[in-house]
Design a protein with these regions (language model features):
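Conserved AMP-binding/adenylation subdomain of ANL enzymes
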Residues: 133-163, 170-206
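Short hydrophobic alpha-helices that are characteristic scaffold elements of the AMP-binding
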Residues: 30-36, 58, 172, 180-184
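ATP-dependent adenylate-forming carboxylate-activation enzymes
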Residues: 20-21, 38-56, 68-71, 187-205
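Conserved AMP-binding/adenylate-forming
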Residues: 2-47, 166-167
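Active-site charged/polar residues at nucleotide-handling catalytic sites that mediate phosphoryl
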Residues: 58-62, 81, 204-206
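Conserved S/T- and glycine-rich ATP-binding loop of Class I adenylate-forming
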Residues: 16, 33, 64, 109, ...
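Conserved pre-ATP/AMP-binding loop-to-beta segment of ANL
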Residues: 96-114, 120-121, 126, 131, ...
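Structural detector for helix-capping/boundary residues
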Residues: 14, 50, 62, 107, ...
């Protein structure tokens, strides 16, 4: 929050684009943008440059946070948006904000996501706090059912933590919503940045 406030004066309602693989910093920047009053824009980093250029042009971000990896159009991205391009971990030397107050209305824009573009040019989907969290109830019910299953089908001395292993990218709504639902219930959320590492990651979890 502190970093974003310094990087974007009067941040309320301003767009912050996230262009990165799944990582810890993705979650930090998503929460930070929302708490600072900005709008999170999740982008598919593996789209072609014409597709990305079109989407970035639509949202007109004040800042683009990215992982620095070249997915095929790094040179074009730097040439076009170098002045507002920053690393995903730019916040690391900032002090925690101690004066956070919620100034966002339930129907104010909070997240912008894009469709896949499989049926024509991708479209921006505008999500307010209210409609973004409409699926939260269903997610919590699902988690509760998993806990019930654990207690009725597994030995009580098997102290497993209810967890969700996400292999979808965080620009996908199905995974992005998990950032907000699972941790706040005390459940573990494991993010994979590459499906090819699935079995390695599962082994590391045990």
């Amino acid at each position: 929050v502190t970093y974003l406030r310094g990087a974007i004066p009067d941040i309320k309602g301003k767009r912050v684009a996230l262009l990165s693989k799944n990582c810890y910093e993705y979650g930090v920047n998503a929460f930070g943008t929302i708490l600072a009053g900005g709008v999170v824009v999740t982008l598919n980093q593996k789209k072609t440059w014409p597709e990305l250029e079109y989407e970035i042009g639509l949202v007109e971000p004040s800042l683009i946070l990215n992982d620095g990896i070249d997915y095929g159009c790094r040179d074009q991205l730097v040439a076009a948006y170098g002045p507002i391009l920053r690393p995903m971990d730019s916040f690391k030397d900032s002090e925690p904000a101690m004066d956070i107050t919620n100034t966002r209305g339930h129907d104010d824009l909070m997240v912008l996501m894009f469709t896949s573009g499989t049926t024509g040019r991708s479209k921006a989907v505008m999500l307010s706090e209210r409609n973004f969290f409409t699926t939260t109830g269903a997610q919590v019910v699902f988690g509760g059912a998993m806990l019930d299953y654990k207690h009725t089908h597994m030995p009580e001395n098997k102290n497993d933590v209810l967890s969700n292993f996400c292999i979808l990218p965080l620009f996908h709504l199905g995974t992005f919503i998990c950032l907000f639902v699972w941790p706040c219930k005390g459940w573990a959320l494991n993010l994979s940045s590459d499906l090819r590492d699935f079995y390695r990651d599962v082994r590391l979890m045990h």
